[in-house]
Amino acid sequence: MRVVTAGIGLRAGHVLTTLKAAMPEVEIVGFYDPQPTFLDMIGPDTPRYASVEAMLAGAAPDLYCVFSPNLFHLDHIRLGLEAGVQVFTEKPVVVSIEETLELARLLANHGGVNRCMVGLVLRYSQHMVDLRAALKAGQLGQIVSLEASEHIAPYHGAFFLRDWRRMTDLSGGFLLEKCCHDIDIYNMITDSRPVRVASFGGRKSFIPGNAPASNAEAEIFHVKKSVWNSVDDAFHSDGDIIDFQTAILQYETGASLAFRTNLNSPDEHRRFCVMGTHGMAEGDFVRGYLRVTARDGTRLADHDYTSGAAVKGAHYGADEMMCADIAKYLRGQSNRLPVSILDAMEAGIAAIAVDQARNTGQMVDLTDTWAKLDSYGLRK
């Protein structure tokens, strides 16, 4: 399995080494990256190419991975589709609704959604494996409402305010970059898409008035390294992303979601509560549990993920599970993955619309946008 990558940052290095562990026949035969900071993770002797086009033509890959910054994704995915190679792209897929519709056109013209896999890794987590089983068994009944949050620690929030991800034109915004995972799994749980969204938020923590007063106090805000287009000070950042946000989403099924995020949460968590007509599910990725309870109070499931595979590696053990599933898929041992590129595109549209609502102060209706996306016939 000959693999090449556009981008060799920390995420690329981690996923590629995890994939190689799951699939020993993987051979990384080329990379394109003007600033290959984490090249040691895939091997310093990996052939370097001057462009994606040269790499796709010269390396004869079986799999082409897109790990470049978000604003480059559409063009890099386009090159892979046009070259006829299987593509894997890191989330989020693209940075605007217009780019999403252009990608839909490209996929429709180049073999459909199976041509491109996506790294929406939370779908692979044991939490979601077990929750899907509860949903399939009908333990929750019809989904009525959800509440959820992703609250990240100050060291991680500071990374976003220092890194290239601080600029919406480069990343698509914080909600798209970081919380598209979460929006995707709630689309999955409701088995539908948001039709109306509203949002409020801004920046109140990472501002000059809250800057640390000493070098010792400042250390926590530099724990996570940024390597491209970065600034040194999260509190005097030129970034335009939020550090707190609340969103309200209404789904095609009539279910609703209240979602919150905060980038300055010392005791971080990533939790969810799903209320159905016949039961409920409550869990937390960070704190490692999932409980399913019937409407008569009977505890139907009580999963503890604080030991074993779920606490190993990144994303609560889901990276290893994702790479194991991708290995089976590429070997022809399975015919589908838990998440598709179209799922990622739909989550991305929802995240972008939420930010549109926050910026305009108005509710955003997605009916016309879904009609445009559906016109490409990708959902089969």
Cite the ranges covered by each PLM segment.
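Receiver (REC) domain switch-region micro-motif
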Residues: 31, 64, 146
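N-terminal Rossmann-like dinucleotide-binding module
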Residues: 1-43
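Beta-strand-loop-alpha-helix segment that lines the small-molecule cofactor/substrate pocket
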Residues: 58, 63, 69-70, 74-123, ...
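Glycine-rich phosphate/pyrophosphate-binding beta-alpha loops
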Residues: 180, 260-269
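C-terminal glycine/acidic-rich active-site capping loop/insertion
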Residues: 203-253, 270-343, 376-380
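Predominantly a Rossmann-like dinucleotide-binding segment in NAD(P)-dependent oxidoreductases
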Residues: 113-114, 122-235, 361
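Short acidic-hydrophobic, aromatic-tinged amphipathic segments that line or gate anion-handling sites
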Residues: 47-51
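C-terminal helix-rich "cap/oligomerization" subdomain common to oxidoreductases
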Residues: 63-65, 108, 113, 252, ...
